[in-house]
Design a protein with these regions (language model features):
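Short flexible coil/turn linkers enriched for glycine and charged/polar residues
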Residues: 88, 135-136, 162, 201, ...
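Thr-Gly-centered strand-to-loop micro-motif
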Residues: 46-47, 103-104, 144, 196-197, ...
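Short Pro/Gly-enriched beta-strand edge/turn motifs at strand-loop
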Residues: 65-67, 188-191, 202-204, 245-251
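Long C-terminal interaction/binding lobes of large macromolecular proteins
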Residues: 207
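Pseudouridine synthases involved in rRNA/tRNA modification
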Residues: 1-37, 82, 198-201, 211-214, ...
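Short, well-ordered beta-strand micro-motif
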Residues: 64-66, 220, 266
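Short histidine-centered loop motifs in beta-beta connectors
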Residues: 48-50, 214-222
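RNA pseudouridine synthases
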Residues: 1-180, 184-191, 259, 285-293
Length: 294
């Protein structure tokens, strides 16, 4: 079993505190994760000695906690090679290919992003995607390597510490070259379809038209919320569905998927405070649709 150990020296003001208090208040572990650690012998140590979460610690005591969640066992074949854009001990950012689901169904034997990451890391640990991408969407996608980092990243996902940009090719030209689409989204019926609904979840997307040609437009979209199919639903709501989007627009011969690409990602690393800023070029199938490329 692989591990990821965090270390913390108790400051004078926490003298007499319980281990649980330090883990939650200073290291940012959730109550659920602390509870799970209680059932893993040796996961928490104070000055090198196994400790309980209810134990008292004193100033200058060193607390070590293993937040790794890898487990032994075979992992499924991954399929295509993983395109890694950035990684460290706690997180990995990949360039996701088109036509691949993040998670697989038990009745489908097909490559998934989760299986690709498992094979790359050589582990059968739980997969922790942070910004999920639809099957047809390409580009930058972040995943945590352990449950602790997943919790930390999810807390900042829709804040200024985790910003995402997408490029989309739309059918039609937005009436306003740039703007904000601020309309709620909800599931429509029993289908895997969503739509604008006054009773739905608040949803906001900022967009900017970069290029127009032959009734199409290249749009940069910045979602500030994370609803399922948000950009697809929002662009369709202003009369500009994504090219190739069978669900919210119509199919096309040029592209067999929605023309959507996760093109930029900027985050502040929850542990190191390093600024991670990445850009990802348009995939070939979208580049081929731009003016002058045919």
């Amino acid at each position: 079993m692989s591990s990821r150990t965090l270390e913390y020296t108790v400051p004078p003001e926490k003298d007499g505190a319980r281990v649980r208090s330090v883990l939650q208040g200073y290291l940012g572990l959730s109550a659920g994760l602390v509870t799970r650690l209680k059932h893993r012998p040796g996961a928490v140590r104070v000055n090198g000695i196994p400790a309980r979460t209810i134990d008292i610690v004193h100033a200058l005591d060193v607390i070590e906690v293993d937040v790794g969640d890898a487990r032994p066992g075979a992992f499924a074949p991954a399929g295509p090679a993983l395109d890694v854009a950035w990684e460290d001990e706690d997180l990995i950012i990949i360039n996701k290919p088109a036509g691949m689901a993040v998670h697989g169904r038990s009745d489908r034997h097909e490559p998934t992003v989760g299986a690709m990451v498992a094979a790359y890391l050589g582990t059968n640990a739980p997969f922790h995607p942070v910004n999920r991408l639809d099957r047809g969407t390409t580009g930058l996608m972040c995943a945590a390597k352990n449950g602790y980092m997943h919790e930390r990243l999810r807390r900042i996902l829709h804040t200024d510490e985790f910003r995402r940009e997408y490029l989309a090719i739309c059918v039609g030209v937005p009436e306003q070259a740039e703007g904000v689409i601020d309309v709620p989204i909800a599931r429509v019926g029993e289908e895997k379809r969503f739509g604008v609904d006054p009773q739905g979840a608040p949803s906001l997307t900022r967009y900017e038209t970069l290029l127009t040609w032959n009734g199409l437009s290249l749009v940069r979209a910045r979602p500030e919320t994370g609803r399922t199919h948000q950009i697809r639903v929002h662009m369709a709501s202003i009369g500009c569905p994504l090219l190739g989007d069978r669900l919210y627009g119509r199919a096309c011969m040029e592209l067999d998927r929605p023309a959507l690409h996760s093109s930029a990602l900027r985050l502040i690393h929850p542990l190191t405070r390093e600024i991670v800023e990445l850009n990802c070029a348009l995939p070939e199938d979208m580049v081929a649709l731009l003016p002058g490329k045919k």
